[in-house]
Amino acid sequence: MKKTAFLLALLLAAVFILPADAATYEAEGLFRLRYDEAAYTLDDQTYAYESETGASRWFFVLYNDEMTFDMSLLRMENDAGLTLSTAAEERRQSYLKELLDWYQDEDASLLETVEAGDGQTPFWVLGLRNEFGPYLMAETVIDGNAIDLQAYYNDSSLAADERLQEALREMLAGFEQDGETPVLEK
């Protein structure tokens, strides 16, 4: 009886919790991101040619009629080896200060820290505004690589509100570190 109840509960959880149209984007050696393929269109080709070599790498945009998520990486020579999930609290705070200083021209403010779906990757979520309008950015660092996930409404007149922030949290819930160092040519 207990086994039957457990299996029924597991089946119900799978039906109601897991997206029916789950897809996975994989940045080999770095991370995987599960997302709802029915809700978002993936474009991982448009800017791929711009990041084949060098210190930066564009991964993709996920978008629908209302909002867009844009993910990229920047290798930080001065922070080689830094991983936020394993860094001492003092180092994490000094990096956060550097990050906020870097984006001061975009009125950066720390909104929250979100633990990714793997339970081991902290992302700082910043509220920002540039010449294109308001947006959110979630950033973490893995082995000296800053990984950014930007979120914005396609209508740039809309504020980066709680609804957009919740959509960003949901996207981060599908993030999982791969645990290996990505290979980027200089």
State the predicted function of each range.
Residues 43, 99-107, 172-179:
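Sec/Tat-exported extracytoplasmic proteins
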Residues 48-146, 156-157:
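Conserved polar/disulfide-associated segments of primarily extracytoplasmic proteins
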Residues 22-57:
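N-terminal "mature-domain start" segment
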Residues 8-15:
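Bacterial N-terminal signal peptides
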Residues 30, 86, 90, 158-166:
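Soluble non-cytosolic domains of exported or imported proteins
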Residues 39, 146-186:
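Surface-exposed amphipathic alpha-helical segments
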Residues 1-5:
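Positively charged n-region of N-terminal signal peptides that target proteins for export
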Residues 15-21:
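C-terminal segment of classical bacterial N-terminal signal peptides
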